[in-house]
Amino acid sequence: MKKKKALISIPYLVSIVFLPWWVSLSFNKSLEPWITNWWNSEQSETFLNDIQEKNVLERFIELEELFLLDEMIKENPETHIQKFRIEIHKQTIQLIKTHNEYNLHIILHFSTNIICFVILGGYFFLSNEELIILNSWIQELLYNLSDTIKAFSILLITDLWIGFHSTHGWELMIGSVYNDFGLAHNDQIISGLVSTFPVILDTIVKYWIFHYLNRVSPSLVIIYHSMNE
């Protein structure tokens, strides 16, 4: 019975790990030409939101001031007016092109993420029996571990996710989600989320240890608190 569970659970676990990556890669390649063609031919707006437009205008003004200052300090500024205009035109085109590529990247990744969530949801729904077997197999594996290893694993996972050094990891993860879904980067919101999520998770873990582990395995709780101290 254990061997049968392992034969079913291991391939299913591997498929769960690699399916999102495979779906993302496949749909990125297949959707990219279609989205690029749609954006360049039918989309009238250059910017996805007002924040992007504001950032581009600020960058354009900055470039214009830098080039103007550069021309003013030259010996014969009048002879460089035409060159100045040409250079500003080139930089403007490059700036808009860069933001156009960035918008395509946002739309492509957002579409791929939505499709990936839908496919994963359907996969879990259709493979409900395999999911139950996987859950049973994991519970058996955890049950066979010693209390010391269990306590060490809990301590390691909690330190990685809600420990003192987890802040930078949360910033990278939330920033990555922001980029994938095309949300404008906001340091205040990210800072608030980084300071909130670990606290919520820490509270949930403490409640789980107090409510569940104290009832199931008091010795595990004692070992965990001893290691934590």
From Swiss-Prot:
It catalyses: K(+)(in) + H(+)(out) = K(+)(out) + H(+)(in). Its main location: plastid. One of its GO terms (biological process) is potassium ion transport. GO terms for molecular function: antiporter activity; proton transmembrane transporter activity. The keyword Transmembrane applies. It is a multi-pass membrane protein. It comes from the Eukaryota. PANTHER family: CHLOROPLAST ENVELOPE MEMBRANE PROTEIN, CHLOROPLAST ENVELOPE MEMBRANE PROTEIN-RELATED. Contributes to K(+)/H(+) antiport activity by supporting proton efflux to control proton extrusion and homeostasis in chloroplasts in a light-dependent manner to modulate photosynthesis. Prevents excessive induction of non-photochemical quenching (NPQ) under continuous-light conditions. Indirectly promotes efficient inorganic carbon uptake into chloroplasts. This is Potassium/proton antiporter CemA. It comes from Dioscorea elephantipes (Elephant's foot yam). The lineage of its organism: Eukaryota, Viridiplantae, Streptophyta, Embryophyta, Tracheophyta.
